[in-house]
C-alpha cells in the first residue's frame, strides 16, 4: 500500500502532467517554440523527435496511439525517442518502468501501461505493483526486478531528467523536434491531431536550419 506522502506526490504529479506545456513566450500565431540556442542530438545524422510524457498524464494516454501510428510512417532520417518525465521523486519508478520495459524488449507494454493506469485504474506506482503487473503480461519477474534497479536504467533516467531540464518541460505531452523546436497540443490549438501535424511541419524546418 502506498504511503500517504507518496500518494500526495503522485496526486501532485498527475495534476502537473495533465497541464499541456505552455511556454512563457512564443511567436504570435506559431504553434511551436524556437529553441535558442539549439540543443545537441543524441543521435548524430538523424532528426530526433523527443516525446516528453508521463504515465500519470491522461493527455499522454490519449495521444499515444496517434504517436504510434505516426512513428510507422515517419521519414527515414527521423528517430522517435520517448522521454518519461518525473515532476517529483514519487514519479521516478514510472521512469524506471519505461526503461525497464525497453531493456526487456517489451515495447508493446508501453501503451498497455497507459491503459492499465487510466483505463483499468491500476495503481502502478511502486516497484512491487509494477512487478506484479508485468508478470501478468508474461515478463519474467526476476529479470524485471534485476533490470529495474540496474545502472543502465538509472543512467537513462538521469538522461531523461537532463533532457527535461534542457527543454524546460513543465507539462506533458510535449515534443522536441531536431533540438530546435518544441510543440505541444496546446500550442497546436488544443489539438492532439494538430500537434502531430505540427511535428510533420517542423521536421523539414529542422533539416533546413
UniProtKB/Swiss-Prot annotation:
One of its GO terms (molecular function) is disulfide oxidoreductase activity. It is found in: Periplasm. GO terms for cellular component: periplasmic space. Its main location: periplasm. Residues 1-27 form the signal peptide. PROSITE patterns: THIOREDOXIN_1 (PS00194), THIOREDOXIN_2 (PS51352). CDD domains: DsbA_DsbA. It comes from the Bacteria. Disulfide bonds join 57-60. InterPro entries: DSBA-like_thioredoxin_dom, DsbA/DsbL, Thiol_disulfide_DsbA, Thioredoxin-like_sf, Thioredoxin_CS, Thioredoxin_domain. The keyword Magnesium does not apply. Residues 28-165 form the Thioredoxin domain. Keywords: Disulfide bond, Periplasm, Redox-active center, Signal. Belongs to the thioredoxin family. DsbA subfamily. Involved in disulfide-bond formation. Acts by transferring its disulfide bond to other proteins. This is Thiol:disulfide interchange protein DsbA.
Amino acid at each position: 500500500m502506498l504511503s500517504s506522502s507518496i500518494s500526495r506526490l503522485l496526486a501532485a504529479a498527475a495534476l502537473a502532467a495533465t497541464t499541456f506545456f505552455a511556454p512563457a513566450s512564443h511567436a504570435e500565431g506559431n504553434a511551436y517554440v524556437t529553441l535558442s540556442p539549439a540543443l545537441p542530438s543524441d543521435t548524430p545524422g538523424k532528426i530526433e523527435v523527443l516525446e516528453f510524457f508521463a504515465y500519470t498524464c491522461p493527455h499522454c494516454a490519449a495521444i499515444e496511439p496517434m504517436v504510434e501510428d505516426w512513428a510507422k510512417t515517419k521519414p527515414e532520417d527521423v528517430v522517435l525517442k520517448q522521454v518519461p518525465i518525473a515532476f517529483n521523486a514519487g514519479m521516478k519508478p514510472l521512469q524506471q518502468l519505461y526503461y525497464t520495459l525497453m531493456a526487456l524488449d517489451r515495447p508493446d507494454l508501453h501503451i498497455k501501461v497507459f491503459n492499465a493506469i487510466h483505463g483499468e485504474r491500476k495503481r502502478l506506482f511502486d516497484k512491487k505493483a509494477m512487478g506484479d503487473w508485468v508478470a501478468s503480461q508474461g515478463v519474467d519477474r526476476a529479470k524485471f526486478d534485476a533490470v529495474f534497479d540496474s545502472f543502465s536504467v538509472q543512467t537513462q533516467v538521469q538522461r531523461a531528467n537532463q533532457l527535461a531540464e534542457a527543454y524546460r518541460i513543465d507539462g506533458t505531452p510535449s515534443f522536441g523536434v531536431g533540438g530546435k523546436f518544441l510543440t505541444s497540443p496546446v500550442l497546436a490549438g488544443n489539438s492532439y491531431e494538430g500537434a502531430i501535424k505540427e511535428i510533420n511541419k517542423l521536421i523539414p524546418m529542422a533539416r533546413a536550419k
